[in-house]
């Protein structure tokens, strides 16, 4: 086993002796990965660093996709080359047989009923213009089902495998409508529902008899509705949600008797609860998890309809429960490793449950839980995949602890507290700190396995703290909305409060703090650099927003209405003025720390222009800035070869500007 080293002392010394002025960095450009990765101002990566980090970058993970048609194996997603592909596993711990060999990473995968054929979504170069491909694992042949000039997602098979419902922008290039195709006649796909402006439709489940389609409509994080579409007469009826009293409702599946459906809802203004509701008109939900105060994040029902399995998110940690759908009794599955659980899926024989599990010390892998005779009882746990960890001894990896720090405002006359996960290296410190802020913003940092975080802790000797600042999901609806619109910079003030807290911790070094974030987290990096340059050493901005107005004007049409709800409508003069005022690009003179900016050329969410304009403005002012752009990536780096170089460059950046 290879044990992580605490630092690269010789490499740090070499960097300290290498004169690199800001002007030289600005004009030093080189490429790698067949010219697809462009680096400006970034030093060449030393070979010893590449070798040192290889162990972390060789870490793999696996995710469950589907049981095979005969039920004796499963399809998983994992990576052996540069991109994630479909593999088949026949037995617990068995070999992973690669089934697909596409150049691009696979997206969503659903198996055709009664067959091993797979419907797979895939884009090109990270542009998110997904196409739907029908792949036959037996012959290894594939054919395009979508029209190749629109965005197509959420494929869903009918019970007999003859029809495929899906979401597509093919009507006008921007509206996410609901479509239906006969798989043998994909060119004659039918438009089922036109999505009203500012919303999208997506298929969720077919009823067992094939008559009804459960449809999800999404307006924003606070308003999502569920519809029942009768495929006989094409009539549509809202069954959950409301235009007058909006709530978040996520459809999961029909029951197995064609009498009702399951969904996750916060309609009672509290945690997201699991509910069942009849499909008959004018019925009300029956809440199944009223005794649990945490959000339900996942649910699955067995093919015979007798068992259910749901997952809760308890301040970032997952708990798995089994449900007797007849008595409505449930029990928690104990003796599971503490971590994150996702994607529960029952075996066709109804006697096993597959799910993904990640802990702070083990990558995401697939586990199968045998089920007891009593419906809500569990049996033995089997691990089906054992993902490689690059030869590292993961028992040495830092385990995060949950902390809460006070921020600037008050609740019931007491300071509001912000939850955060803290990873610390060995030793008394004081340790340098990297603040890791999540994107979204309607997201949450959860302590899943992260080779990158462990790399920073072990190889740089830094502490890593990941706060769930206001606007994060997983807590309550009030907390989720606390950064909307004109409240945007309150989230930045939560970062300032974290800097105050760091200063009070004897094991943390307040004079050596850097910040890292992607997407909305990239905006927070830039905004923190505006407000707290005197308290930060450096920042890493990955596909971040630099100007809210240009971002909203240039993001893809199908995304714009949803982002306006979160950030504000730039067409409104008052809001436009506010967004201009708080945008980091318009406050670039206040940024006085070195930055590493990372971008994908094909990003449809945060266009590359957002990174290009902040880099240009910083260079104009003589600020140290490293810039990395991948020509074959989008919103983040999916290709391992690109991700490797960017992570290596980030280590160099932190060594030069945080540790020295």
Tell where the protein language model's regions lie, with residue ranges.
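N-terminal secretory signal peptides that target proteins for export/translocation
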Residues: 1-6
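Bacterial N-terminal signal peptides
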Residues: 9-19
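Boundary at the C-terminal end of the N-terminal hydrophobic targeting segment
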Residues: 22-26
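Beta-propeller blade-edge and WD-like acidic-aromatic loop motif
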Residues: 27-49, 78-98, 117, 121-144, ...
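Conserved beta-propeller blade repeats
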Residues: 58-77, 96, 103-121, 132, ...
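Generic beta-strand/beta-sheet core signal
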Residues: 216, 229, 264, 277, ...
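Cap/lid segment of the alpha/beta-hydrolase catalytic domain
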Residues: 378-380, 385-519, 531, 552-563
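Active-site-proximal cap/loop segments of hydrolase catalytic domains
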Residues: 414, 467-660
């Amino acid at each position: 086993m290879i044990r992580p080293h605490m630092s690269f002392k010789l490499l740090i010394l070499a960097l300290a002796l290498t004169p690199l002025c800001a002007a030289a960095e600005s004009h030093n450009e080189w490429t790698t990965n067949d010219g697809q990765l462009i680096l400006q101002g970034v030093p060449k990566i030393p070979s010893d660093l590449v070798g040192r980090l290889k162990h972390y970058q060789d870490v793999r993970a696996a995710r469950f996709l589907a049981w095979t048609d005969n039920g004796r194996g499963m399809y998983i997603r994992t990576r052996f080359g540069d991109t994630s592909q479909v593999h088949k596993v026949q037995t617990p711990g068995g070999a992973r047989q690669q089934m697909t060999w596409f150049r691009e990473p696979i997206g969503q995968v659903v198996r055709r009923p009664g067959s091993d054929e797979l419907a797979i979504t895939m884009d090109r170069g990270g542009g998110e213009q997904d196409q739907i491909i029908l792949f036959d694992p037996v012959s290894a042949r594939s054919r395009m089902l979508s029209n190749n000039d629109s965005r197509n997602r959420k494929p869903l098979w009918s019970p007999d495998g003859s029809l495929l419902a899906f979401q597509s922008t093919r009507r006008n290039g921007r509206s996410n409508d609901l479509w239906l195709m006969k798989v043998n006649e994909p060119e004659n796909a039918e438009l089922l529902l036109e999505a009203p402006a500012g919303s999208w439709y997506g298929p969720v489940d077919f009823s067992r008899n094939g008559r009804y389609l459960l449809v999800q409509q999404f307006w924003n994080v606070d308003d999502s509705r569920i519809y029942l579409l009768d495929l006989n007469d094409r009539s549509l009826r809202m069954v959950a949600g409301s235009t007058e009293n909006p709530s978040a409702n996520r459809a999961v599946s029909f029951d197995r008797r064609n009498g009702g459906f399951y969904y996750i809802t916060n309609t009672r203004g509290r945690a997201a609860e699991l509910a069942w509701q009849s499909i008959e008109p004018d019925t009300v939900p029956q809440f199944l998890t009223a005794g649990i105060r945490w959000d339900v994040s996942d649910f699955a029902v067995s093919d015979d309809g007798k068992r259910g399995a749901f997952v809760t998110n308890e301040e970032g940690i997952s708990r798995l429960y089994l449900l007797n759908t007849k008595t409505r009794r449930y029990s928690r599955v104990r003796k599971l490793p503490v971590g994150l659980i996702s994607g529960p899926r029952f075996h066709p024989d109804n006697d096993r449950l597959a799910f993904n599990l990640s802990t702070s010390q083990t990558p995401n892998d697939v586990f199968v839980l045998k089920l007891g005779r009593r419906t809500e009882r569990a049996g033995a746990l089997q691990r089906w995949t054992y993902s490689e960890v690059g030869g590292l001894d993961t028992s040495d990896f830092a385990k995060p602890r949950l902390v809460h720090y006070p921020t600037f405002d008050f609740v019931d006359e007491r300071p509001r507290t912000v939850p955060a996960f803290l990873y610390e290296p060995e030793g008394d410190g004081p340790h340098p700190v990297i603040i890791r802020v999540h994107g979204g913003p309607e997201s949450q940092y959860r302590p899943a396995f992260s080779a990158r975080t462990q790399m920073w802790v072990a190889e740089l000797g830094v502490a890593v703290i990941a706060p769930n600042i206001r606007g994060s999901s997983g807590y309550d609806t009030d907390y989720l909305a606390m950064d909307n619109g004109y409240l945007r910079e309150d989230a930045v003030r939560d970062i300032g409060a974290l800097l105050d807290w760091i200063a009070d911790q004897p094991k943390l070094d307040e004079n050596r703090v850097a910040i890292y974030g992607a997407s909305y987290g990239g905006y927070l990096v830039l905004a923190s650099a505006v407000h707290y340059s005197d308290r930060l050493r450096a920042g890493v901005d990955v596909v971040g927003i630099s100007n809210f107005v240009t971002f909203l004007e240039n993001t893809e049409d199908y995304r714009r209405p949803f982002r306006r709800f979160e950030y504000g409508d730039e067409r409104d003069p008052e809001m436009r003025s506010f967004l201009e005022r708080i945008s980091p690009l318009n406050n670039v003179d206040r940024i006085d720390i070195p930055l590493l900016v990372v971008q994908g050329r094909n990003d449809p969410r945060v266009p590359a222009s957002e990174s290009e304009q902040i880099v240009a403005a910083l260079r104009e002012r003589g600020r140290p800035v490293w810039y990395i752009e991948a020509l074959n990536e989008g919103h983040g780096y999916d290709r391992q070869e690109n991700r490797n170089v960017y992570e290596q460059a980030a280590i160099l950046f932190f060594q030069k500007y945080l540790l020295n």
